[in-house]
Amino acid sequence: EKQSKKIAKHIIISVPVWDYYKPKKELALKAYQVLKEVKADSGLIIFHPFRYHKDSDMWYYAPHFHVIGFGWVENVVETYQKYGYIIKNLGKRETLFGTIYYQLSHCGIKKHNHSLVYFGDCSYSKLIVEEEEQESKKCPHCKEYLQELECNTNYNLKPDPNIMEPWYMAKS
C-alpha cells in the first residue's frame, strides 16, 4: 500500500528512566520495536536527548524520539505495559514541513550520526528512483531529430564554434 494514502502523524516516544543509561543506538532499536507494536510501520524518526524545563529555563537529560509516522497508532497501553516506553500520538499536523523543521531545530546532533532517519517503507532501501527520459533534441530550423557526431581531428579545418559546440546534426 502506498504511504501517500495514509495520514502522517506526529508521535512522541519517551524512553523510561531505567533505560536512560543505554546508548542512542540501543534506544533507537527499541523505539523501532515499539513503533511496530503500535502499527506505525514507516516514517521518519528524530532523536532528542534533552527536554526543556520552562520554570528553570534549563535543558535536562530525558531521551525521546519524535516520529512522523504512517499507520494506525493502536495498542498503546499494552505496549507501554510491555516495554515502559510512553507513546503519545499528537495526530495529524497542520504542516509536516513546519513540524519537521521545528523538531530538527533542537534535536540531538552527534558526529557520525544522522539527525533524521527514515524507516519502514520510507527507508532508502525501499526508495525506487525512476530514470527520467531525456528530451529529444530537434533542429530548430527543420525540426528533425539530431544525431550525435564524432569529431574527426585529422583535418586542420577550423569550423564555426557555434556549429561544433553541441556536436549534433539532423538525420538525413
Which stretches of residues belong to each language-model region?
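Right-hand nucleic-acid polymerase module
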Residues: 1-61, 70-172
